[in-house]
Design a protein with these regions (language model features):
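Transmembrane beta-barrel wall of Gram-negative outer-membrane proteins
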Residues: 170-200, 210-277, 317-328
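Extracytoplasmic beta-strand/coil segments of soluble accessory domains associated
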Residues: 70-108, 128
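Face-selective signature of the C-terminal outer-membrane beta-barrel domain
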Residues: 254-271, 310-470, 478, 494-496, ...
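N-terminal periplasmic accessory domains that precede
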Residues: 69-72, 88-91, 103, 118-123, ...
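Conserved C-terminal beta-signal and adjacent last beta-strands/turns
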Residues: 12, 21-23, 194, 256, ...
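Gram-negative outer-membrane beta-barrel transporters
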Residues: 445-452, 570-578, 587-589, 594-682, ...
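Short acidic/polar hinge/loop motifs at secondary-structure boundaries
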Residues: 108-134
Length: 714
């Protein structure tokens, strides 16, 4: 999406708390106090851990009034790119969401459908901290951690008694947010319950493009002159505003057996709905009335047809339920957890629309037939590990289990906007996988300066029970299972110099199973029997049950430096080499696959070759005095796939900001620059051109009382 289509958002918030976090005078966002992280599954100082780590705190989230977890990550963390066109599209060191393990209180929340994370499902105001570990972590966390780990920790009670927080926020595009939290700590019990509701009418976007050459409509016919996109297609209008309505609630209950042992059950549930409203057309008749159906002649002699369905977007629905039960024994350094991520609803509906002239108002209300793709999924997992202190050695051993499944159904709807109305299924797809793992890590503190980490993980991965059925044509398939095993070693060194400087180097091997939708999902294309040959007339997307796991080797070196208590800086260089890289293959050549003739070709995920990623990351923080502090981070990244450069990655990512904190005021200003993500020959400054963009943010916080705060953010 071109930067010129990025929107400005203004929010005004009121935060009220009964002894709430929001009213407590806290240290500056960029203060350099030591931070403990869990990059090695053991407590380590941020400056000492042999990895590149960023931390986002509850105060960061509160002061910036971030509307989503993805926004908090993309705005502050080094090397993370947040897509401006999707709430959930992030990449880290060139790896996408499916290759970044995301956990909430230790529970993985990557979905079983395509491995991505719907960030809108995670209530952002309930987050205590986010730890971002960049680089391969598969030796401890498994295959989804080839790009890194994002660990989200939710809030716990810190004081006895009953406490509560209220946040009310309103902004542009009818954006509102309500957050209500209540916490109670009494004797051995901690209980935290909360509710969050977000709603927005959205903004005009997602423009409609047409290719020239279609001439099936004879009436009406109109002459028009419209602009072109970066793909040399004609922009004729748009779907309108993408309205979002999400509602979530959460419960976290902890029983403390004593100071060292506790049992915690947490649950959060989210409903997320979206729809496009108020479609618009740039094609108009002589009276200036919008046209959504007709034949369009251009001044250059080219032409195309437009249909009302082109201007109608999607109606989407998601429902998540995440359960997590954890036992922690800090004294004996034993931890165990079992969890379920149950995505009860996931999918969307669409329509071809009416094939007749229609007004904008009637098109918005049109509720004729359509289709729905519905793909709920489940992820079950278990992890337990124990740590032993053996002289100069800290030994950690653990085991883990993870299973995923999805079942996709495609329906014909009588009312394309109503998912609960009359419908009939015409396609079924699904499959499962599971992984058993054991892992071991040893930290050898050779002396007070040198620490050596060595670890290994064994994975046994199986994909099975894959199926596909086309109910209209009677074609059904079952797929053979596949089993793979892999050893994933990791080795790291950390050396402390005398002048508050730490050097580190690491190597990690990763084993990444393919996501289930790439293995077992076909993209609906009608199968017909033509003279005894099963045939698909249009191009289809096929399942690939033979898809193999990727393997990667990641190398990293870095240095971290402190100057007193006011300045910290770090530099790291990395390179990741991937074998059997999974890429999207497409051909227009007529091909027979699985006994079906695809006349116009097909698309499919395949192990196509090797990929190489490399990059540099720089981070610096400085506290001038008690009032002023600043930060800057920069990432350069590049990827080649079989020798060809991947232009979809931004080469340069820059974040910088400054904070002023005095008396009752806390003022923040920060900015982000993302370089272009397109080939050099693409025309810039047009829709669909991935131009560079620059985002600035301002946040004004005023503590009215110790329990109430006013916020204004841009």
């Amino acid at each position: 999406m071109s930067g010129k289509f990025l929107s400005k958002a203004i929010l005004f918030s009121l935060v009220i708390g009964a002894n709430a976090f929001s009213g407590v005078s806290a240290a500056n966002v960029y203060e350099l106090a030591p931070v403990v992280v869990t990059a090695t599954k053991t407590a380590e100082s941020l400056e000492k851990v042999p990895a590149s780590v960023s931390v986002v705190t509850a105060k960061d989230i509160e002061d910036h009034n971030y509307s989503s977890t993805a926004q908090a990550l993309g705005a502050t963390s080094t090397g993370i790119y947040l897509s401006p066109v999707a709430d959930g599209g992030i990449s880290m060191r060139g790896f996408g969401s499916a290759d970044i393990l995301v956990m909430v209180d230790g529970q993985p929340v990557n979905n079983g459908w395509n491995g991505s994370v719907d960030w809108g499902m995670i209530p952002v105001q309930n987050i205590e901290r986010i730890e971002v570990v960049r680089g391969a972590a598969s030796s401890l966390y498994g295959g989804r951690a080839v790009g890194g780990v994002i660990q989200i920790t939710t809030k716990e009670n810190k004081e006895d008694g009953l406490h509560g927080d209220v946040l009310l926020s309103t902004g542009s595009n009818s954006t509102t947010k309500q957050v209500y939290d209540a916490k109670i700590k009494k004797d051995k019990w901690d209980v935290n319950v909360g509710y969050e509701k977000r709603k927005t009418d959205g903004w005009r976007g997602y423009f409609i493009e047409e290719r020239p050459g279609y001439n099936d409509i004879s009436d009406p016919t109109v002459d028009a002159d419209v602009g072109t996109s970066a793909r040399d297609r004609y922009i004729v209008g748009g779907r309108g505003r993408k309205a979002i309505d999400s509602e979530s609630y959460h419960v976290k209950t902890t029983y403390h057996f004593n100071e060292d042992k506790k049992l915690t059950y947490s649950y959060f549930h989210t409903n997320y709905n979206y729809a496009y409203n108020d479609p618009f057309s740039f094609i108009k008749d002589k009276d200036g009335k919008e046209i959504f159906y007709g034949h369009v002649n251009l001044p250059n002699g080219k032409y195309f047809d437009i249909y009302p369905g082109d201007f109608l977007g999607y109606v989407g629905q998601k429902e998540w339920a995440v359960h997590n039960l954890a036992y922690d024994d800090d004294k004996n350094q034993f931890h165990a957890r079992i969890g379920l991520t149950d995505i009860k609803k996931d999918g969307y509906s669409s329509t071809g629309g009416p094939e007749e002239s229609i007004s904008a108002g009637d098109l918005q209300k049109w509720n004729g037939d359509g289709s729905q793709s519905f793909y709920p999924s489940k992820t079950k997992d278990f992890d337990m590990h124990k740590t032993w202190e053996l002289g100069q050695h800290t030994l950690l051993a653990g085991m883990a289990y993870r299973s995923e499944s999805f079942d996709q159904t495609r329906y014909k709807l009588t009312n394309w906007r109503n998912h609960d109305g009359p419908k009939s299924a015409y396609e079924l797809h699904g499959g499962k996988d599971e992984s058993w793992s054991g892992y071991l890590q040893d930290k050898w503190q050779a002396n007070n300066r040198l620490a050596v980490y060595a670890g290994v993980r064994f994975d046994r991965y199986k994909k099975y029970d894959g199926y596909g059925s086309y109910l209209d044509s009677g074609v059904s398939r079952t797929y053979a299972e596949g089993t793979y095993t892999e050893w994933s070693p990791k080795f790291s060194l950390e050396y402390a110099l005398r002048n508050d400087t730490t050097l580190f180097a690491s190597y990690g091997h990763s084993f990444t199973p393919p996501i289930l939708s790439s293995v077992y999902r076909d993209e609906g294309a009608k199968i017909q029997n033509v003279n005894g040959q099963l045939t698909v007339a249009k191009k289809g997307s096929l399942a690939n049950p033979d898809l193999k796991p990727e393997t990667s080797d990641t190398f990293e070196i870095g240095v971290k430096k402190k100057w007193g208590d006011k300045t910290f800086a770090s530099v790291s260089l990395y390179k990741a080499e991937t074998k059997d890289a999974i890429e999207y293959y497409s051909t227009k050549k007529a091909t027979i696959m699985n006994g079906v003739l695809y006349k116009n070709g097909f698309s499919q995920y395949r192990n196509l070759g090797d990929a190489s990623k490399k990059g540099v990351e720089v981070e610096a923080k400085h506290k001038f005095n008690d009032k002023w502090s600043t930060y800057v981070n920069y990432a350069w990244e590049s990827e080649d796939i079989d020798g060809e450069h991947n232009y979809n990655l931004p080469k340069h990512l820059v974040h910088f900001g400054v904070e002023y904190n005095y008396n009752k005021w806390d003022i923040l200003a920060d900015a982000q620059y993302v370089s272009a993500r397109q080939t050099p020959d693409v025309e810039r400054g047009k829709y669909q051109s991935e131009d560079s963009f620059f985002i600035t943010n301002m946040a004004f916080n005023y503590n009215v009382t110790p329990e109430a705060k006013l916020q204004f953010t841009i």
